[in-house]
Amino acid sequence: MADKLFSIRNYFFLGSYQSCIGEALKFSSKNEEEKQEKDVYLYRSYIAQGQAFIPLKEIPAATKSADLAAVRRYAEFRNNPAAKKKILAEVQEEVASRNIKSEIAAVLAATILNEADLSQDAFRAVSRFEGLEARASKVFILIKMNKRKLAIGEVKKMNQIDEDATLSQLANALVTSFGASGKVKDALYIYSEMSDKYGRTTDLEMHQAVVSILTQDYAAAEELLESALERDNKDADVLINSIVSAQLNEKDDDVVERFISQLKHEHPNHPWVIDFNEKEAEFDRVASDSRA
């Protein structure tokens, strides 16, 4: 039986959000579960594009769907800075009480906690769930926590479910990127194959650039990041890696400063920006004390 939602999900996982939206808007089904799943990826794509106001407007606050309620809460988290602290506390309470009702809700809870740089809580959010998206979330979190061996274990479980699935391939590429130096280029082959098969996306080019940096091919990294920026010049990960690439390619200081300024402007609450601002303030304090 054909998977009617395959293209919608696949475009989302690849970071091709406009294509996901296009497929979702064309989608037609009488099955309520299919329509709801379509809406989940449609609205998550709008959020990823910085248009969180759309799900906030279209998903009723009193929706009975646990998945859509989780999407709406994530949209509120991204759209309303004043609500972030309250939402974060609410998510942490749900994780602590094991009161997360669905895999999508768990993945979105983990996403919120990750964005708050609370990796351990994020892992707890998805720990009970065994679907591919939950396991892919675990892999990302474990790599972020520098626990590659555990991440490999999750990838093996994903491969047992479906080794050809896009999420399994992306998870394989991620753990390979941070493995033995002799195998890092294997990750580049995976990303390149996916680009050839499904088309280039901001996410795929960003990951290819990271592998290029790890293999010291700085010119290739710069080219890939420039292409990614043409697609989305506000993406936080692309901007962060552009800062790294500019420094490695020995660009003028004003180029690096421009990327930093843009990142600060677009993502003032990003963990990288918060850490940078703290270090910058500490440097200024030490410099001021030394002049006193």
From Swiss-Prot:
Pfam hit, one: Coatomer_E
Keyword vocabulary terms for this entry: Cytoplasm, Cytoplasmic vesicle, ER-Golgi transport, Golgi apparatus, Membrane, Protein transport, Transport
Protein localization: Cytoplasm; Golgi apparatus membrane; Cytoplasmic vesicle, COPI-coated vesicle membrane
A biological process term (GO) from this entry: intra-Golgi vesicle-mediated transport
GO cellular component: COPI vesicle coat; Golgi membrane; mitochondrion
GO molecular function, a single term: structural molecule activity
Membrane topology designation: Peripheral membrane protein
Entries under Gene3D superfamilies matching the protein: Tetratricopeptide repeat domain (1.25.40.10)
InterPro entries: Coatomer_esu, TPR-like_helical_dom_sf
Stated family: Belongs to the COPE family.
Subunit structure: Oligomeric complex that consists of at least the alpha, beta, beta', gamma, delta, epsilon and zeta subunits.
Protein purpose: The coatomer is a cytosolic protein complex that binds to dilysine motifs and reversibly associates with Golgi non-clathrin-coated vesicles, which further mediate biosynthetic protein transport from the ER, via the Golgi up to the trans Golgi network. The coatomer complex is required for budding from Golgi membranes, and is essential for the retrograde Golgi-to-ER transport of dilysine-tagged proteins.
Name of the protein in question: Coatomer subunit epsilon
Organism: Caenorhabditis elegans
Designated gene of the protein: cope-1
